[in-house]
Amino acid sequence: MKKVIFSGIQPSGQLTLGNYIGALKQFGQFQDEYECFYCIVDEHAITVPQDRLKLREQTRSLAALYLAVGLDPEKATLFIQSEVAAHAQAAWILQCNVYIGELERMTQFKDKSDGKAGVSAGLLTYPPLMAADILLYQTDLVPVGEDQKQHIELTRDLAERFNKKHADIFTMPEVFIPKQGARVMSLQDPTKKMSKSDANLKNAIFLLDPPATIRKKIKSAVTDSSGIIEYNKEEKPGVSNLLTIYSVITGETISTIEEKYVGKGYGDFKTDLAELVVAELEPIQERYYAYLKSEELDTILDAGAEKAARVANKTLKKMENGVGLGRKRRR
Protein backbone atom coordinates (compact mmCIF):
# COMPACT_ATOMS: atom_id res chain seq x y z
CA MET A 1 0.00 0.00 0.00
CA LYS A 2 1.38 3.38 -1.04
CA LYS A 3 2.12 6.03 1.56
CA VAL A 4 -0.01 9.18 1.35
CA ILE A 5 1.40 12.63 0.56
CA PHE A 6 -0.66 15.77 1.12
CA SER A 7 0.53 19.09 -0.29
CA GLY A 8 -1.34 22.38 -0.06
CA ILE A 9 -0.50 25.70 -1.68
CA GLN A 10 -2.27 29.04 -1.50
CA PRO A 11 -3.53 30.61 -4.76
CA SER A 12 -1.70 33.87 -4.11
CA GLY A 13 1.12 35.23 -6.23
CA GLN A 14 2.71 33.57 -9.25
CA LEU A 15 4.76 30.41 -8.88
CA THR A 16 8.47 30.86 -9.44
CA LEU A 17 11.32 28.89 -10.94
CA GLY A 18 12.25 28.19 -7.31
CA ASN A 19 8.87 26.54 -6.68
CA TYR A 20 9.33 24.50 -9.84
CA ILE A 21 12.85 23.30 -9.09
CA GLY A 22 12.25 22.81 -5.38
CA ALA A 23 8.94 20.95 -5.60
CA LEU A 24 6.85 20.92 -8.79
CA LYS A 25 9.51 19.29 -10.95
CA GLN A 26 9.25 16.22 -8.71
CA PHE A 27 5.51 15.67 -9.28
CA GLY A 28 6.16 12.90 -11.77
CA GLN A 29 8.26 10.91 -9.31
CA PHE A 30 5.91 11.54 -6.37
CA GLN A 31 2.73 10.45 -8.15
CA ASP A 32 4.36 7.18 -9.23
CA GLU A 33 5.63 6.34 -5.75
CA TYR A 34 2.91 7.76 -3.46
CA GLU A 35 -0.83 8.36 -3.18
CA CYS A 36 -0.79 12.13 -3.70
CA PHE A 37 -3.38 14.74 -2.76
CA TYR A 38 -2.64 18.22 -4.12
CA CYS A 39 -4.91 20.85 -2.62
CA ILE A 40 -5.31 24.50 -3.61
CA VAL A 41 -5.98 25.97 -0.18
CA ASP A 42 -8.22 28.93 -0.96
CA GLU A 43 -9.74 28.92 2.54
CA HIS A 44 -6.30 29.61 3.96
CA ALA A 45 -5.93 32.49 1.51
CA ILE A 46 -8.87 34.43 2.98
CA THR A 47 -7.22 34.71 6.40
CA VAL A 48 -6.00 38.00 4.91
CA PRO A 49 -8.07 40.32 2.66
CA GLN A 50 -8.55 39.09 -0.92
CA ASP A 51 -10.26 40.41 -4.02
CA ARG A 52 -12.91 37.75 -4.72
CA LEU A 53 -12.60 37.79 -8.50
CA LYS A 54 -8.81 37.74 -8.40
CA LEU A 55 -8.85 34.88 -5.88
CA ARG A 56 -11.04 32.75 -8.14
CA GLU A 57 -8.88 33.58 -11.14
CA GLN A 58 -5.69 32.67 -9.27
CA THR A 59 -7.23 29.44 -7.99
CA ARG A 60 -8.08 28.23 -11.49
CA SER A 61 -4.73 29.47 -12.80
CA LEU A 62 -2.82 27.51 -10.17
CA ALA A 63 -4.74 24.34 -11.02
CA ALA A 64 -3.85 24.75 -14.70
CA LEU A 65 -0.20 25.31 -13.80
CA TYR A 66 -0.09 22.17 -11.64
CA LEU A 67 -1.32 20.14 -14.60
CA ALA A 68 1.05 21.91 -16.97
CA VAL A 69 4.14 20.99 -14.94
CA GLY A 70 3.26 17.32 -15.03
CA LEU A 71 0.60 16.43 -12.47
CA ASP A 72 -1.34 13.48 -13.89
CA PRO A 73 -4.98 13.46 -12.67
CA GLU A 74 -5.10 9.71 -13.28
CA LYS A 75 -2.32 9.19 -10.74
CA ALA A 76 -2.80 12.08 -8.28
CA THR A 77 -5.79 13.95 -6.86
CA LEU A 78 -5.99 17.70 -7.57
CA PHE A 79 -8.76 19.67 -5.88
CA ILE A 80 -9.81 22.98 -4.36
CA GLN A 81 -10.05 23.11 -0.57
CA SER A 82 -13.34 25.01 -0.36
CA GLU A 83 -15.03 22.44 -2.62
CA VAL A 84 -14.57 19.72 0.02
CA ALA A 85 -16.69 20.79 3.00
CA ALA A 86 -15.03 18.30 5.34
CA HIS A 87 -12.00 20.58 5.65
CA ALA A 88 -13.90 23.37 7.41
CA GLN A 89 -15.92 20.90 9.49
CA ALA A 90 -12.87 18.98 10.67
CA ALA A 91 -11.05 22.25 11.35
CA TRP A 92 -13.78 23.28 13.82
CA ILE A 93 -13.49 19.99 15.72
CA LEU A 94 -9.71 20.35 15.92
CA GLN A 95 -10.06 24.01 16.87
CA CYS A 96 -12.03 22.83 19.91
CA ASN A 97 -9.09 20.59 20.85
CA VAL A 98 -6.30 23.17 20.57
CA TYR A 99 -5.34 25.77 23.17
CA ILE A 100 -5.14 29.51 22.47
CA GLY A 101 -1.63 29.59 23.92
CA GLU A 102 -0.49 27.04 21.35
CA LEU A 103 -1.88 29.14 18.51
CA GLU A 104 -0.40 32.38 19.83
CA ARG A 105 3.05 30.79 19.95
CA MET A 106 3.04 30.07 16.22
CA THR A 107 5.86 32.06 14.62
CA GLN A 108 3.91 32.69 11.43
CA PHE A 109 1.02 34.24 13.37
CA LYS A 110 3.43 36.49 15.25
CA ASP A 111 5.12 37.59 12.02
CA LYS A 112 1.91 38.28 10.09
CA SER A 113 0.09 40.00 12.95
CA ASP A 114 2.98 42.03 14.37
CA GLY A 115 2.13 45.72 14.45
CA LYS A 116 -1.08 45.27 12.46
CA ALA A 117 -4.54 46.40 13.48
CA GLY A 118 -7.65 44.34 12.76
CA VAL A 119 -5.95 40.94 12.49
CA SER A 120 -8.55 38.27 11.64
CA ALA A 121 -9.31 35.36 13.96
CA GLY A 122 -8.74 33.16 10.91
CA LEU A 123 -5.05 34.03 10.98
CA LEU A 124 -4.85 32.77 14.56
CA THR A 125 -6.80 29.58 13.82
CA TYR A 126 -4.93 28.85 10.58
CA PRO A 127 -3.05 25.86 12.12
CA PRO A 128 -6.16 23.78 13.01
CA LEU A 129 -7.38 24.17 9.42
CA MET A 130 -3.97 23.11 8.15
CA ALA A 131 -4.08 20.16 10.53
CA ALA A 132 -7.51 19.20 9.19
CA ASP A 133 -6.20 19.37 5.62
CA ILE A 134 -3.48 16.89 6.48
CA LEU A 135 -5.24 14.55 8.91
CA LEU A 136 -8.40 14.02 6.83
CA TYR A 137 -6.42 12.01 4.27
CA GLN A 138 -4.54 9.83 6.79
CA THR A 139 -1.43 11.52 5.50
CA ASP A 140 1.96 9.91 6.06
CA LEU A 141 4.20 12.59 4.55
CA VAL A 142 3.92 16.37 4.19
CA PRO A 143 6.45 18.20 1.98
CA VAL A 144 6.88 21.62 3.60
CA GLY A 145 9.40 24.43 3.92
CA GLU A 146 11.11 25.56 7.10
CA ASP A 147 8.39 28.15 7.75
CA GLN A 148 5.73 25.43 8.08
CA LYS A 149 7.57 22.85 10.19
CA GLN A 150 6.18 24.34 13.42
CA HIS A 151 2.64 23.86 12.08
CA ILE A 152 3.36 20.20 11.33
CA GLU A 153 4.60 19.74 14.89
CA LEU A 154 1.30 21.20 16.15
CA THR A 155 -0.61 18.94 13.75
CA ARG A 156 1.13 15.93 15.27
CA ASP A 157 0.35 17.18 18.78
CA LEU A 158 -3.32 17.60 17.86
CA ALA A 159 -3.48 14.16 16.26
CA GLU A 160 -1.92 12.52 19.30
CA ARG A 161 -4.19 14.45 21.70
CA PHE A 162 -7.32 13.55 19.72
CA ASN A 163 -6.33 9.90 19.41
CA LYS A 164 -5.80 9.60 23.16
CA LYS A 165 -8.85 11.60 24.21
CA HIS A 166 -11.51 10.47 21.74
CA ALA A 167 -10.54 7.63 19.44
CA ASP A 168 -7.50 6.31 17.64
CA ILE A 169 -8.36 7.85 14.28
CA PHE A 170 -5.43 9.75 12.81
CA THR A 171 -2.23 8.66 11.12
CA MET A 172 0.75 10.59 12.52
CA PRO A 173 2.17 12.67 9.65
CA GLU A 174 5.88 13.21 9.14
CA VAL A 175 7.68 16.14 7.54
CA PHE A 176 8.90 15.04 4.12
CA ILE A 177 12.23 16.36 2.87
CA PRO A 178 12.55 15.52 -0.85
CA LYS A 179 15.79 13.88 -1.96
CA GLN A 180 16.54 16.68 -4.38
CA GLY A 181 16.03 19.84 -2.42
CA ALA A 182 17.78 22.39 -4.62
CA ARG A 183 17.21 25.81 -3.10
CA VAL A 184 16.90 28.64 -5.63
CA MET A 185 17.78 32.06 -4.32
CA SER A 186 16.73 35.59 -5.26
CA LEU A 187 18.38 36.90 -8.43
CA GLN A 188 19.10 40.32 -6.93
CA ASP A 189 19.79 39.21 -3.35
CA PRO A 190 21.17 35.65 -3.47
CA THR A 191 21.35 35.47 0.32
CA LYS A 192 17.57 35.01 0.51
CA LYS A 193 15.21 32.49 -1.07
CA MET A 194 13.43 33.24 -4.35
CA SER A 195 9.83 34.02 -3.33
CA LYS A 196 6.52 34.30 -5.18
CA SER A 197 5.48 37.08 -2.81
CA ASP A 198 8.58 39.25 -3.29
CA ALA A 199 7.64 42.88 -4.00
CA ASN A 200 10.64 43.28 -6.32
CA LEU A 201 9.70 41.36 -9.48
CA LYS A 202 13.35 41.32 -10.61
CA ASN A 203 14.19 38.94 -7.78
CA ALA A 204 12.25 36.01 -9.23
CA ILE A 205 11.68 34.21 -12.51
CA PHE A 206 7.99 33.37 -12.67
CA LEU A 207 6.83 30.27 -14.52
CA LEU A 208 4.65 32.39 -16.80
CA ASP A 209 7.28 35.04 -17.59
CA PRO A 210 7.67 35.55 -21.36
CA PRO A 211 11.07 34.65 -22.89
CA ALA A 212 12.21 38.27 -23.20
CA THR A 213 11.54 38.88 -19.51
CA ILE A 214 13.42 35.73 -18.50
CA ARG A 215 16.45 36.75 -20.56
CA LYS A 216 16.40 40.25 -19.08
CA LYS A 217 16.14 39.01 -15.48
CA ILE A 218 18.98 36.52 -15.84
CA LYS A 219 21.16 39.06 -17.62
CA SER A 220 20.72 41.49 -14.72
CA ALA A 221 21.16 38.83 -11.99
CA VAL A 222 23.71 39.79 -9.34
CA THR A 223 27.12 38.13 -9.68
CA ASP A 224 30.51 39.62 -8.67
CA SER A 225 33.53 41.28 -10.25
CA SER A 226 35.82 38.25 -10.65
CA GLY A 227 34.30 36.98 -13.88
CA ILE A 228 35.18 33.39 -12.89
CA ILE A 229 32.37 30.85 -13.06
CA GLU A 230 32.79 28.66 -10.00
CA TYR A 231 30.60 27.43 -7.16
CA ASN A 232 31.26 29.07 -3.79
CA LYS A 233 28.11 29.90 -1.81
CA GLU A 234 29.90 32.04 0.75
CA GLU A 235 32.09 34.17 -1.52
CA LYS A 236 30.13 33.95 -4.81
CA PRO A 237 26.45 33.45 -3.85
CA GLY A 238 25.09 34.99 -7.06
CA VAL A 239 27.08 32.80 -9.46
CA SER A 240 26.51 29.76 -7.24
CA ASN A 241 22.76 30.31 -7.47
CA LEU A 242 22.88 30.49 -11.27
CA LEU A 243 25.02 27.34 -11.38
CA THR A 244 22.43 25.54 -9.25
CA ILE A 245 19.67 26.49 -11.70
CA TYR A 246 21.80 25.39 -14.67
CA SER A 247 22.62 22.07 -12.99
CA VAL A 248 19.03 21.17 -12.07
CA ILE A 249 17.67 21.99 -15.52
CA THR A 250 20.36 20.13 -17.48
CA GLY A 251 21.14 17.34 -15.03
CA GLU A 252 24.85 18.17 -15.37
CA THR A 253 27.06 18.33 -12.29
CA ILE A 254 28.31 21.68 -11.05
CA SER A 255 31.92 20.68 -11.78
CA THR A 256 31.04 19.77 -15.39
CA ILE A 257 29.44 23.18 -15.90
CA GLU A 258 32.42 24.95 -14.32
CA GLU A 259 34.79 23.15 -16.73
CA LYS A 260 32.58 24.06 -19.68
CA TYR A 261 32.93 27.77 -18.91
CA VAL A 262 36.63 27.96 -18.08
CA GLY A 263 37.96 31.08 -19.80
CA LYS A 264 34.47 32.38 -20.54
CA GLY A 265 32.77 35.30 -18.86
CA TYR A 266 29.48 35.84 -17.10
CA GLY A 267 27.90 37.18 -20.29
CA ASP A 268 28.22 33.88 -22.16
CA PHE A 269 27.14 31.90 -19.11
CA LYS A 270 24.05 34.02 -18.47
CA THR A 271 23.04 33.95 -22.14
CA ASP A 272 23.23 30.16 -22.25
CA LEU A 273 21.41 29.80 -18.93
CA ALA A 274 18.61 32.10 -20.09
CA GLU A 275 18.04 29.96 -23.18
CA LEU A 276 17.96 26.81 -21.05
CA VAL A 277 15.34 28.31 -18.75
CA VAL A 278 13.27 29.55 -21.69
CA ALA A 279 13.40 26.08 -23.30
CA GLU A 280 12.36 24.47 -19.99
CA LEU A 281 9.40 26.79 -19.38
CA GLU A 282 7.99 27.28 -22.91
CA PRO A 283 6.27 23.85 -23.13
CA ILE A 284 4.90 24.33 -19.60
CA GLN A 285 3.44 27.68 -20.63
CA GLU A 286 1.90 26.17 -23.76
CA ARG A 287 0.19 23.44 -21.74
CA TYR A 288 -0.90 25.96 -19.11
CA TYR A 289 -2.73 28.21 -21.57
CA ALA A 290 -4.30 25.17 -23.26
CA TYR A 291 -5.68 23.94 -19.91
CA LEU A 292 -6.85 27.41 -18.94
CA LYS A 293 -9.03 27.63 -22.07
CA SER A 294 -10.29 24.06 -21.83
CA GLU A 295 -13.34 22.62 -20.08
CA GLU A 296 -11.10 19.68 -19.20
CA LEU A 297 -9.66 21.71 -16.32
CA ASP A 298 -13.05 21.97 -14.62
CA THR A 299 -13.76 18.29 -15.28
CA ILE A 300 -10.48 17.36 -13.58
CA LEU A 301 -11.19 19.63 -10.59
CA ASP A 302 -14.73 18.25 -10.23
CA ALA A 303 -13.44 14.68 -10.24
CA GLY A 304 -10.66 15.60 -7.81
CA ALA A 305 -13.11 17.18 -5.36
CA GLU A 306 -15.37 14.11 -5.51
CA LYS A 307 -12.50 11.72 -4.82
CA ALA A 308 -11.08 13.91 -2.04
CA ALA A 309 -14.51 14.21 -0.42
CA ARG A 310 -14.98 10.42 -0.38
CA VAL A 311 -11.71 9.97 1.49
CA ALA A 312 -12.11 13.00 3.77
CA ASN A 313 -15.70 12.20 4.76
CA LYS A 314 -14.70 8.79 6.10
CA THR A 315 -12.27 10.43 8.51
CA LEU A 316 -14.73 13.21 9.35
CA LYS A 317 -17.42 10.70 10.36
CA LYS A 318 -14.96 9.01 12.71
CA MET A 319 -14.08 12.41 14.19
CA GLU A 320 -17.76 13.28 14.70
CA ASN A 321 -18.41 9.92 16.36
CA GLY A 322 -15.35 10.42 18.53
CA VAL A 323 -16.61 13.71 19.98
CA GLY A 324 -20.33 12.82 19.93
CA LEU A 325 -21.61 15.08 17.16
CA GLY A 326 -24.90 14.32 15.43
CA ARG A 327 -26.97 11.16 15.70
CA LYS A 328 -25.36 7.76 15.88
CA ARG A 329 -26.39 5.82 12.78
CA ARG A 330 -25.76 2.31 11.63
CA ARG A 331 -24.87 3.54 8.16
Swiss-Prot record:
Entry's EC annotation: 6.1.1.2
Annotated GO biological process: tryptophanyl-tRNA aminoacylation
Positions of ATP binding: Q10, P11, S12, G18, N19, G145, E146, D147, V184, K193, M194, S195, K196, S197
SUPFAM superfamilies, A to Z: Nucleotidylyl transferase (SSF52374)
UniProt record similarity statement: Belongs to the class-I aminoacyl-tRNA synthetase family.
CC annotations in GO: cytosol
Domain of life the protein comes from: Bacteria
Residues spanned by motif 'KMSKS' region: 193-197
Gene: trpS
PROSITE patterns found in the cross-reference section: AA_TRNA_LIGASE_I
Sorted UniProt keywords: Aminoacyl-tRNA synthetase, ATP-binding, Cytoplasm, Ligase, Nucleotide-binding, Protein biosynthesis
Keyword Protein biosynthesis included in the entry's annotation: yes
The protein's role, per its UniProt record: Catalyzes the attachment of tryptophan to tRNA(Trp).
Catalytic activity from the UniProt record: tRNA(Trp) + L-tryptophan + ATP = L-tryptophyl-tRNA(Trp) + AMP + diphosphate + H(+)
Annotated InterPro entries: aa-tRNA-synth_I_CS (IPR001412), aa-tRNA-synth_Ic (IPR002305), Rossmann-like_a/b/a_fold (IPR014729), Trp-tRNA-ligase (IPR002306), Trp-tRNA-ligase_bac-type (IPR024109), Trp-tRNA_synthetase (IPR050203)
Gene3D superfamilies: HUPs (3.40.50.620), Tyrosyl-Transfer RNA Synthetase (1.10.240.10)
Binding residue positions for L-tryptophan: D133
Subcellular location: Cytoplasm
Pfam families with a match to the protein in the record: tRNA-synt_1b
GO terms of molecular function: ATP binding; tryptophan-tRNA ligase activity
Motif ('HIGH' region): 11-19
Main location: cytoplasm
Assembly: Homodimer.
Protein name as catalogued: Tryptophan--tRNA ligase
